[in-house]
Amino acid sequence: MFAELEKIFGKQKLVAGAMIYQQNDADHNGYILLNGKVELSRRHNNKVIERGVFISSGQVFGVFTSLFNTKARRWTATTVIASEIITIPEKVIDKKIEDMDPFLRYCLFQWYALEHSSKQN
């Protein structure tokens, strides 16, 4: 399913416990988990406040930072077991967003605004 992307971007093999990105990092790359398992976690005041959000093989993660142009990552992504990922560079994601149909882009941003506001209420 991801063979074409793997040919273009390659893949990385990661050991269990490898940090893919850390909360507050400024990079905007996206990732596809080819196989393995990744846990998302986040901290507040140096205490873990959320854990147990898992990414499974075939899922995309880390793209919201680029999609919604946020300043920093809200989560830390760490492999739970040996895993393989494809990294999609920020510039590729940005180009896809720029080329996206304007109506679909509007819908996506409206959905995000609605989701974000409902979680703060």
Residue ranges and their predicted role:
Residues 73, 92-121:
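A small-molecule sensor/coupling module
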Residues 1-18:
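Short proline/glycine- and basic residue-enriched helix-capping loop/turn segments at helix->loop/beta transitions
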Residues 13-14, 18-81:
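Cyclic nucleotide-binding regulatory domains
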Residues 86:
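Conserved active-site beta-strand element of glycosyltransferases/polysaccharide synthases
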